[in-house]
Amino acid sequence: MKTFAIYAATALAEIAGCFAFWAWLKLDKSVWWLVPGMAALALFAWLLTLIESEGAGRVYAAYGGVYIAASLLWLWVAEGKQPDHWDISGAMVCLVGTVMIIAGPR
């Protein structure tokens, strides 16, 4: 459960940081959006180091599924665009992969 909470916080930090750049470049927001965006991206990188694993690549691979699902949640909550059934199905496949990577016997 702790691992999932860290992955969820990591996804929020990364998506918020990337959205700050999106807002600046695509939505004509102030360049000052980059200040919290950069802080969020630094937090994202730090949070990934808190995951217990013998390899960074495995952490990043497992995180990928969480990121995909969290991005679709962001699309819905922050941007007001509801994911379609293809989005949801794709995210579920990725989350199955995440569980296999995290819980697989080593």
Swiss-Prot record:
Supply the alphabetized keyword list: Cell inner membrane, Cell membrane, Membrane, Transmembrane, Transmembrane helix
> Where is the protein found, in the record's own terms?
Cell inner membrane
Q: Which cellular component, as a GO term, is one annotated location?
A: plasma membrane
| Membrane topology category | Multi-pass membrane protein
An example of a Pfam family matching this protein is: UPF0060
- List residues traversing the bilayer: 4-24, 31-51, 59-79, 85-105
State the family it belongs to. Belongs to the UPF0060 family.
Protein name in UniProt: UPF0060 membrane protein Plav_2230
Source organism per UniProt: Parvibaculum lavamentivorans (strain DS-1 / DSM 13023 / NCIMB 13966)
Q: What is the lineage of its organism?
A: Bacteria, Pseudomonadati, Pseudomonadota, Alphaproteobacteria, Hyphomicrobiales
